[in-house]
């Protein structure tokens, strides 16, 4: 049976979920060394045919992933360079860990990206095995503007696209064509070497071409698509001249397009997702069941406005208590994915997970035996030190006792400053991974 302390149960569920997507553990589970054989996700590679093993990568989880690869390969790595977010470094023996800015790229990211591109280019050979470590944040950290372009050129182009109303798929198509590494270009540099990518997914649906902008995956967009996007949004003449010149050269066939499905540059590439939101949610469900709750997965692909998603979850919790549908209490409703918060001109401090908890608190007001929890698996929710927050039927009343009006804080997107005085923030510290968000509703209907 569930304990009377819903927070204690939720804490155990959260810890189990985060442990299941630990970057080091994920790599070690996917990568096994048996003598001269390297087993990767069911495939066996004969290390005897490779003279050099080179490790490259980018993302928040890059350092623990690199440490794990070094431990598994035990002195066999020839060289390596991995770029991580500031403060996310860790000691390694052979692989060089470089830090750069995230989410806004900086010159250190450019230097790191070009350094990685140069290493891959220099080591590319039939008898080289490349291991590429990709995780959340990789797109902003793996910055290697194509020849003739500067970081400022790419930034200005992205700003114009965002202001014009272009969607993320259109923006990514442009980004890939302005990079030395994105959109399969890293794989092209590594050919004819063997390339294995170990990937921690931070995107809804685990789309390989989207994670870190798909440096080791075929790209379906073309130079023509890019030109059409810029023309359609009326910014062809506004983008920096070097960007327009590169597009024109691509259209004239003077610059190769990004690798497409079937391109020989991708023949020696294996892409393996070693950790994902679904894995975290599955482990959370298992832990909830051990604690006496009937788990139910709503979806791992939930997107949309945060407060609307919260109200849907709260409505399901109320339905469980009112009718026993879609399942009876005690139960645990779980979901994953990544929602969005639309900010107005007047906003405070918070993040999508804290906003979820606050919106849920308003819809659960006065309801006993329900706990709502939402957290970012990277340990960060918005520009704060919190990963998320928890809320229950008493949260609104407890806030009111301290002069905090929950609805006003929600309107101002100021959930951090609502939950902090209540001691209801979830503080995990940086987890050095990112598989999006985890949300759960524990429903018992019993007074704690």
Model segments located where?
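Active-site segments that bind and position negatively charged phosphate/pyrophosphate groups
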Residues: 278, 282, 286, 292-374
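Glycine-rich oxoanion-binding loops at beta->alpha junctions
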Residues: 83-126, 174-175
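Active-site cofactor/substrate anionic-group-binding motifs, chiefly glycine-
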Residues: 47-49, 58-88
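N-terminal amphipathic/basic leader segments beginning at the initiator methionine
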Residues: 1-48, 64, 71, 225, ...
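Accessory alpha-helical/coil subdomains and C-terminal extensions
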Residues: 175, 193-196, 218-312
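Internal helix-turn-beta structural module
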Residues: 357-448
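Conserved phosphate- and dinucleotide-binding cores of soluble alpha/beta proteins
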Residues: 126, 130, 140-212, 220-227, ...
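Gly/Ser/Thr-rich active-site loops/lids in small-molecule metabolic enzymes
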Residues: 149-167, 219-234, 346-372
């Amino acid at each position: 049976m569930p304990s009377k302390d819903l927070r204690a149960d939720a804490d155990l569920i959260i810890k189990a979920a985060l442990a299941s997507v630990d970057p080091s553990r994920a790599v070690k589970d996917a990568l096994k060394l048996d003598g001269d054989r390297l087993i990767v996700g069911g495939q066996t590679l004969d290390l005897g045919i490779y003279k050099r093993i080179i490790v490259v990568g980018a993302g928040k989880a890059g350092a623990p992933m690199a440490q794990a690869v070094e431990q598994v390969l035990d002195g066999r790595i020839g060289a390596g360079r991995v770029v991580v977010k500031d403060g996310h470094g860790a000691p390694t023996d052979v692989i060089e860990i470089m830090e750069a800015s995230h989410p806004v790229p900086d010159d250190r990211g450019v230097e790191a990206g070009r350094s990685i591109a140069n290493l891959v280019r220099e080591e590319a050979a039939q008898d080289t095995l490349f291991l590429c470590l990709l995780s959340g944040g990789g797109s902003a950290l793996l910055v290697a503007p194509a020849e003739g372009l500067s970081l400022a050129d790419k930034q200005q182009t992205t700003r114009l696209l965002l202001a014009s109303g272009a969607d993320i798929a259109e923006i990514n198509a442009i980004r890939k064509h302005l990079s030395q590494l994105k959109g399969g270009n890293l794989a092209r540099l590594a050919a004819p070497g063997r390339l294995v990518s170990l990937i921690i997914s931070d995107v809804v649906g685990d789309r390989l071409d989207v994670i870190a902008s798909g440096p080791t995956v075929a790209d379906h967009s073309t130079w023509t698509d890019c030109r059409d996007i810029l023309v359609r949004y009326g910014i062809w003449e506004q983008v920096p001249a070097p960007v327009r010149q590169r597009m024109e050269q691509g259209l004239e066939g003077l610059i190769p397009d990004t690798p497409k499905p079937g391109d020989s540059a991708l023949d020696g590439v294996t892409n393996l997702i070693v950790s994902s939101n679904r894995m975290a949610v599955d482990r959370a469900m298992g832990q909830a069941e051990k604690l006496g709750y009937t788990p139910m997965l709503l979806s791992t692909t939930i997107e949309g406005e945060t407060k609307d998603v919260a109200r849907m979850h709260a409505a399901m919790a109320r339905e469980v208590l009112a009718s026993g549908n879609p399942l009876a209490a005690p139960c645990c409703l779980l979901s994953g994915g990544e929602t969005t918060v639309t900010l107005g001109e007047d906003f405070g401090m918070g993040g999508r997970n804290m906003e979820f908890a606050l919106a849920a608190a308003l819809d659960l007001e006065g309801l006993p035996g329900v706990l709502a929890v939402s957290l970012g698996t990277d340990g960060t929710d918005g520009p704060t030190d919190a990963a998320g927050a928890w809320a229950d039927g008493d949260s609104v009343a407890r806030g009111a006792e301290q002069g905090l009006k929950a609805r006003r804080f929600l309107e101002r997107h100021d959930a951090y400053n609502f939950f902090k005085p209540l001691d209801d923030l979830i503080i995990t510290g940086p987890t050095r991974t990112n598989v999006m968000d985890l949300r759960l509703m524990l429903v018992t209907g019993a007074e704690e």
